[in-house]
Amino acid sequence: LGLAAGACSGNGILFDITDPRAPERIDAVSDSGFAYWHSATFNNDGTKVLFTDEWGGGTRPRCRTYDPLTWGADAIYDIVNGKLAFRSHFKMPAPQGETENCVAHNGSIIPVPGRDIFVQAWYQGGLSIIDFTDSANPVEIAYFDRGPIDDTDLVTGGYWSTYWYQGRIYGTEIIRGIDVFALTPSEHLSANEIAA
């Protein structure tokens, strides 16, 4: 692959690391809707990068009906001739309440051959499993949401990150511990894809 990507607070960058002792910055992108470029993840074959925006630092409700859909979201870029080409934003579709801190944070790729699937932590927004195989049209194919920690007061909590490991998804919940999930076949994901 010979590439590295970074989310650098104010922008996203792409490096050529063919020579690890002399990395070369080959592209940088910015997005007026992104407040804090937080993480960068390649798809399975290194042809796309998914960046997250931790708008508000993860401590405020940012997934309400009136919050912009491009803020606190994911930005998906294809890598075309060594350059980052913007394709789309994705933000969880289920609105959250005033007592739920919610914004894109950390996540990981679910390795399904021929597809680009990402499990995204949204703090108290729970987790989304996003199919971004079509970079311009990402879609949520599964989700889990525990609901607010407190119905009357904002308490910072929720999923810090979600990890795929040996057929399971691990959600590290700041207040309530760890949740472990198994994917089940659906119209969006076959048993063979899950087993791959």
Locations of the language-model features?
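Feature marking well-ordered beta-strand scaffolds used for ligand recognition
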Residues: 1-196
